[in-house]
Regions:
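Glycine-rich phosphate-binding loop plus the immediately following alpha-helix
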Residues: 94-146, 150, 187-200, 298-352, ...
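Short beta-strand-loop/turn "lid" adjacent to the catalytic site in phosphate-handling enzymes
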Residues: 29, 47, 51-97, 125-133, ...
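ATP-dependent carbohydrate kinase catalytic cores
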Residues: 134, 188-304, 315, 327, ...
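Glycine-rich phosphate-binding/hydrolytic loop that grips phosphoryl groups
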Residues: 109, 255-259, 313-317, 321-324, ...
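Activation-segment/catalytic-loop signature of the eukaryotic protein kinase fold
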Residues: 366-465
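N-terminal glycine/serine-rich phosphate-binding loop of ATP-dependent small-molecule kinases
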Residues: 1-84, 211, 236, 240-245, ...
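Acidic, glycine/GT-rich loop-and beta-edge segments that sit at the periphery of enzyme/chaperone cores
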Residues: 133, 311, 319-321, 326-347, ...
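Gly/Ser/Thr-rich active-site cleft segment
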Residues: 112-250, 334, 378-382, 410, ...
């Protein structure tokens, strides 16, 4: 409801190909998603909410989307992802390269080095470092790997730009209204140097990039702007009224911060498979100062008119999921036997154990008496994103004994993600970013009181977890109400719509001194893999 913020219908769609881990190779840090999953999800989710409230559907005035980023895809001249063409239907390199894909690490290092040696460091808005998770590294990696991709790829498009382009019928990659948030945060676009780095920069990197550079959209807008109007075909397919406006796309974590009601002084902790920590500052208070070693610092990336900051962990919930999968290995390999007479019963038992294991681990970990000699972990199972990116780092676990239990190991892993969060917050604060309150959103914040309490204990700060299961979608709602003309600004829409009750986690002061001893060991241990 655009007047109250009340959720009157919702829907969730799980991508089937992604669920089967098709086109992925975790051992190679390769994670791809098929564009058909997105199209199927779009039809399902909007169709389901429209069907749930046929009385409200005729009053829908705007649609906005947020997606993971940088999740780009090579497209042809009609802005069609190459994977939707028959000859590329099963080619992972023709699909969307998911944000956490690290196959472009070598290319990222080349870009970082070229930026450092250039007259202008074009990576300065991403902490003087360009990540393998970002647009140009992925683009270069794909082009270098396939002659036919170099032949057939006309441009590369972010997922958050492609969905609005699909809905509005934009079929020229160079003419779409791209996301300012994605361009500034992931593509080295900055007003200070007139947009993207010059062609000479890309030519020095690899001439294979030049056609892409020339053909991508040079026009981007903040998310309080419209990308266009939905086409008649999509209007009919989704059951929407005519004339629905489609907003410029946004990055999910940034939208989540808006949905959580972010304002200056708030750090929003978006805690899911990874973690993104978002903050705002007025431009004049930063005085042109850039924070080194974070993931993004971009004017108007989160809220128009404010500097948006992004930092985070490349693995958060994925760290816990790794441990769950490790413990479930015997269930999957020994208990489940498809040909056995009781195969269905075995499968049900394995699924029941898998569903319950994290909750039980958290219960037991919460009961542990905190000791200095407990196992200590680092959290870099997918590299370190911030502070000071080091994607080559790996996770560690020390202090194991014959008496070490599974809950103690789970505690160490959760504690490591909390220590990483504290390191980021301390780094932001030391560089002038105001931190007065912490707000938690995302799946982990909703599902794991144990992790949230541990975060409060480690950071020494109260954390409010808002009662909104889909904060990122709520941020898109905020943007949609602005482009529909219901509100004059993002801040005005937030005041009207983002008034959620919250659960508060207060730090337990008696645990803080011992946790800080362990934190110092965590930081020291973090130096070992780098020497």
């Amino acid at each position: 409801d655009a007047a109250t913020g009340e959720t009157i219908a919702d829907s969730v769609f799980s991508y089937p190909r992604w669920g089967r881990q098709e086109y992925c190779s975790p051992a190679e840090a390769c994670f791809r998603q098929h564009p058909q999953d997105y199209l199927d999800g779009l039809r399902h989710v909007i169709g389901e909410v429209v069907a749930a409230r046929p009385d409200a559907a005729p009053h829908i005035r705007a649609v906005s989307v947020d997606t993971t980023a940088s999740t780009p895809c090579l497209v042809d001249r009609t802005c069609t992802p190459l994977a939707l063409r028959p000859e590329y239907a099963d080619d992972p390199d023709a699909m969307f390269v998911l944000w956490k894909d690290h196959t472009a690490q070598r290319e990222a290092e080349e870009i970082t080095a070229l930026c450092a040696s250039s007259e202008i460091n074009y990576a300065r808005h991403s902490g003087n470092h360009y990540s393998a998770e970002c647009f140009w590294a992925k683009c270069l990696h794909l082009l270098r790997g396939s002659r036919r991709l170099r032949r057939d790829a006309y441009a590369m498009v972010e997922l958050c730009d492609w969905i609005p382009a699909v809905l509005t019928g934009a079929d020229d990659p160079s003419a779409i209204r791209a996301s300012h948030c994605a361009a500034g945060s992931k593509q080295m676009w900055a007003e200070a140097w007139g947009g993207f780095p010059p062609e000479a920069f890309f030519e020095a990197l690899d001439p294979a990039l030049l056609p892409i550079v020339r053909n991508i959209s040079k026009t981007n807008r903040t998310c309080d702007h419209a990308a266009g109007t939905i086409t008649p075909a999509w209007t009919q397919a989704l059951g929407l009224p005519e004339g629905v406006v489609v907003g410029v796309g946004n990055i999910d974590a940034h939208a989540g911060a808006v949905g959580a009601g972010i304002r200056c002084g708030t750090v929003v902790l978006n805690l899911g498979t990874s973690a993104c920590h978002m903050a705002l500052m007025p431009s004049d208070e930063m005085g042109g100062r850039l924070v080194e070693g974070i993931f993004g610092q971009v004017d108007s990336s989160i809220v128009p008119g404010m500097v948006g900051f992004e930092a985070g962990l490349s693995a958060f919930g994925d760290v816990y999921a790794w441990f769950r999968n490790l413990l479930c290995w015997p269930l999957e390999e020994l208990l489940v036997q498809p040909g056995a007479p009781d195969a269905q019963a075995r499968q049900r038992l394995a699924e029941e154990c898998r569903d319950k294991i994290m909750g039980r681990l958290a219960e037991e970990a919460e009961r542990l008496e905190l000791r200095a000699d407990m196992p200590l972990a680092t959290d870099w199972l997918n590299g370190r994103r911030n502070p000071y990116p080091a994607p080559e780092l790996t996770g560690t676990l020390t202090g194991l004994r014959l008496s070490t239990t599974a809950p103690e190991i789970y505690y160490a892993l959760a504690e490591a993600t909390a220590f990483a969060t504290k390191a980021i917050l301390d780094h932001l604060a030391a560089n002038g970013v105001a931190i007065e309150r912490l707000t938690g959103i995302g799946g982990i914040s909703q599902k794991s009181p144990f992790v949230m309490q541990l975060l409060a204990d480690v950071t020494g700060r109260e954390i409010s977890v808002i009662d909104c299961k889909q904060a990122c979608a709520m941020g898109s709602v905020v943007y949609a109400t602005v482009i529909a003309g219901c509100y004059g600004s993002v801040e005005e829409a937030q005041r009207a719509l983002c008034n959620f009750p919250s659960r508060r986690y207060t730090p337990r002061a008696e645990r803080h001194p011992l946790l800080m001893q362990r934190y110092e060991r965590y930081k020291a241990q973090g130096g070992l893999p780098q020497r």
